[in-house]
């Protein structure tokens, strides 16, 4: 009887192991179909839509380059609206370079589970530039993004730039590794 029970349990484990894994609620989030191309923009090409990133150090406001990176902006705005970033860590902080977040695992290897095709553009990396982090391949961006702490011309044309910090750069400069995003939301101008 013990052998049959063990065989039965092993069989159940094998069958269960072969089924599709269930994603956590954060992994299962998929962006809404926001038409970023239709967002109104100012003379600098930045959207009127403002993302408010609240940290323990204060608030950061970001506007998006919705015409240059419509699919990437649509995805990030969708994730923001669903609360994906709330409570996540800034898992990568390199002084005089970047701060990075957007990984639910906090390791730099996680994301929302849906990769994006690159939308490289001619916007330069200046202080406060917001761009999507990626792996080795150009089409490997997901939910992780970074904010440039200085001008980074060697990154120009190699990463999808999605926005610019328009208020709170002094807050960005205070972020340290493992600081938490209190909340990330969208507000209208």
Each language-model region and where it sits:
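Positively charged n-region of N-terminal signal peptides that target proteins for export
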Residues: 1-5
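Bacterial N-terminal signal peptides
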Residues: 7-15
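Cyclophilin-like peptidyl-prolyl cis-trans isomerases
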Residues: 17-189
């Amino acid at each position: 009887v013990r052998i049959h029970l063990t065989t039965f349990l092993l069989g159940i484990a094998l069958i269960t192991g072969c089924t599709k894994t269930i994603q956590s609620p954060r992994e299962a989030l998929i962006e809404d179909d926001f038409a970023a191309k239709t967002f109104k923009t100012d003379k600098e090409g930045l959207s009127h839509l403002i993302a408010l990133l609240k940290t323990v150090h204060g608030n950061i406001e970001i506007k998006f380059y919705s015409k240059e990176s419509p699919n990437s902006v649509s995805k990030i705005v969708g994730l923001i609206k669903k609360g994906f970033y709330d409570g996540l860590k800034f898992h990568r902080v390199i002084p005089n370079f970047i701060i990075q977040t957007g990984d639910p695992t906090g390791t730099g290897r996680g994301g929302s589970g849906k990769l994006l095709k690159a939308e490289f553009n001619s916007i330069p990396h200046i202080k406060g530039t917001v761009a999507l982090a990626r792996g080795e391949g150009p089409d490997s961006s997901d939910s992780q993004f970074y904010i440039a702490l200085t001008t980074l011309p060697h990154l120009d044309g190699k990463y999808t730039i999605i926005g610019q910090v328009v208020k709170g750069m002094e807050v960005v400069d205070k972020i340290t590794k493992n600081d938490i995003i209190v909340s990330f939301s969208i507000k209208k101008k």
